[in-house]
Regions:
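Long, charge-rich, low-complexity alpha-helical segments
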Residues: 69-132, 182, 193, 198-201, ...
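Short beta-strand micro-motifs in enzyme catalytic cores
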Residues: 150, 399-403, 484
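SAM-dependent Rossmann-like transferase core, predominantly class I methyltransferases
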Residues: 110-192, 197-209
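A general structural signal for short secondary-structure junctions and capping/turn motifs
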Residues: 142-144, 290, 310, 392-397
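Flexible, glycine-/basic-rich loop-and-beta segments that form/coincide
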Residues: 359-444
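S-adenosylmethionine
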Residues: 165-176, 186-187, 218-381
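Conserved SAM-binding motif I beta-strand of class I
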Residues: 212-217
């Protein structure tokens, strides 16, 4: 079954303005949709199961009189139902069916597609029914510290299609995009860059705190979706729909090529990092542009990570998602460490591995993502290609995670620049975290820079145990002393780490009354004995306190 590519939405300013007014009048928002569908149907939709929602919408649309406009739009765009023209006209009176067609948002239905009538809605001829050409759904983003209702258009999701995705598929709101949005440390910046913008979800957030944003994508189709979404949400984003270029620059091209020689205060990306076999005779047009950058293995990530520092301003940061090949189960970070090996000393790097999959699991994940299983012969062939490809590089697994880079602001050639110790952190945190993570990541990186720049200043600071930190002791029954003492965070990254008895004593005494240096001296004096020198204990405690401070177990009082 060949995938079908539908036209991208048109960004006609007058028609989009009419659509915006209709969506507002229909209250087509997350809150209203949740009220209409109910918790069970919403939960099923998150699992790509549409039947409960279809049944609920059929019930709502079968009532006498004019149907609820929000129910009509939810049935059309969230559930992929074929909707009678009269109901669409009533739900979107300013734009109308003709306007919907001119914007490429709907097209005439075919008999084999699901209809509301199949679930009890009064009928109409197929010629009078329309089906969605795009996925258009409510979204919320913070603008000037207030959550505002927005809408995001993208290609139809796999659950609404009958075959594999088209190679030029434009992805919509998904888990990865939401994870990235929640992980960005948001501070006011002049210039921001998004690499691989897709349908522009991240732009909706960036425009709240960036004066000017450049968004790149290899796909012209993706940029068309992005332009449509910007025009549709222009008033909420403080954009002039007639002059998007005043704040937004949409550029077609691969990765950083379109911005050669330019620097940015913030760079973010959910890049096309998916590792894909490169079989002999592969056709470029068969690649999934939204996820496949055309390189072998994880070379795209290596290329992108290696080039990012030269595009960062002083104090500039880059945050992205990515994955990396693992050839040694005990050294998941070998590839990320290699990518950072050539960084200047003033560039900090932090990799957090959130998940890992063995090679077979990885293949299955991305074959399902493209709905390849709907063509069994193609699925088996592509699965074999994945395993052969991983085997050729002795890849055992693939790690997924978040990446945070920052260029410190130092004068090149200065004594400070020469004395810099790079902050390179690689940690595996696969447990639940508290979102949004952005403030936590930003604060951690700032503390790391402070500790590296002037550790004595940390010791001269009054520190207290963070309010979410608890102590956990493990010991055998009847034992006098614990064998393991853990400090556990209840918020943010929710780390847990083993601490020494001395550090546990210091944490117990860190109530915000004393400088860290005084606590270190007092605890070391109490715990020193014939076998433990006080000076050695103080030195060990100083190192441990710096780590506890950077990781957020200790905070400034």
């Amino acid at each position: 079954m060949n995938p079908v590519e539908l036209p991208a939405p048109a960004a006609d300013r007058e028609l989009v303005a009419a659509l915006r007014q209709d969506l507002l009048a229909a209250e087509f928002t997350n809150e209203r949709v949740a009220q209409l569908l109910g918790a069970d149907a919403l939960a099923a939709m998150e699992r790509d199961q549409l039947v409960p929602g279809m049944l609920r919408i059929a019930e709502l649309l079968s009532t006498d009189g004019t149907p609820d406009p929000c129910a009509v739009l939810a049935g059309l765009w969230l559930l992929g139902l074929d909707i009678p023209a009269g109901q669409l006209q009533a739900a979107l009176p300013r734009l109308g069916v003709e306007g919907l067609r001119r914007l490429n948002l709907v097209h005439p239905a075919a008999a084999e597609r699901p209809t509301a009538e199949a679930h009890g809605t009064p009928g109409a001829d197929d010629a009078e029914r329309y089906r969605p050409s795009v996925d258009l759904r409510p979204y919320q983003a913070e603008q000037e510290q207030v959550l505002v209702d927005l809408w995001v258009a993208s290609d139809l999701p796999a659950a609404q299609l009958q075959g594999p995705l088209h190679p030029e598929h434009v992805l919509g709101i998904g888990g990865a995009s939401l994870t990235l949005a929640a992980s960005i440390h948001r501070t006011p910046v002049q210039r921001a860059l998004e690499i691989g913008t897709g349908c522009g979800i991240q732009l909706l957030h960036l425009l709240d705190h960036a004066e000017h944003v450049v968004a790149t994508d290899l796909s012209r189709r993706a940029l068309d979706f992005t332009e449509f979404n910007l025009v549709l949400n222009a008033p909420a984003l403080r954009l002039d729909p007639g002059d998007l270029g005043a704040r937004v620059e949409l550029v077609q091209g691969s990765l950083l090529e379109p911005v050669a020689g330019r620097r940015f205060d913030l760079i973010i990306s959910n890049p096309p990092f998916v590792i894909t076999p490169r079989p002999r005779g592969e056709q470029i047009q068969a690649r999934y542009t939204y996820r496949d950058g055309g390189r072998a293995g994880d070379e795209l990530m290596a290329e992108l990570i290696g080039a990012l520092p030269e595009h960062l301003t002083d104090s500039g940061t880059a945050q992205l998602l990515g994955n990396w090949e693992i050839q040694d189960q005990d050294a998941w970070d070998a590839r990320p460490r290699l990518w950072c090996a050539g960084f200047p000393a003033e560039v900090d790097a932090w990799f957090i591995q959130r998940d890992r999959q063995d090679s077979a699991q990885y293949a299955e994940t991305w074959l399902r993502d493209a709905s390849t299983q709907r063509d069994p012969e193609s699925y088996r062939r592509r699965y074999a290609e994945y395993l052969e490809d991983f085997g050729s590089r002795a890849v055992l697994a693939v790690g997924f995670g978040m990446i945070f880079l920052r260029r410190r602001s130092v004068d090149a050639g200065s004594a400070e620049a020469r004395a810099i110790t790079p902050w390179r952190r690689f940690e595996e945190l696969t447990g639940a975290v508290e979102q949004p993570l952005g403030p936590v990541l930003g604060a951690t990186a700032a503390r790391a820079e402070s500790a590296a720049r002037d550790p004595q200043a940390v010791f001269d600071t009054v520190l207290a145990v963070a309010p979410d930190v608890t102590e956990e002791r493990h010991q055998r029954f009847g034992a006098v002393h614990p064998e393991v003492i853990l400090a556990r965070q209840g918020a943010g990254l929710r780390r847990s780490r083993a601490v020494s008895s001395a550090a546990a004593g210091l944490l117990g005494a860190a109530d915000g009354e004393y400088q860290a240096a005084a606590l270190i001296t007092a605890v070391a004096a109490l715990m020193a004995d014939e076998s433990t020198d006080q000076e050695d204990l103080e030195q060990a405690l100083r190192s441990e306190v710096l780590e506890l401070y950077v990781e957020g177990y200790l905070s400034e009082s």
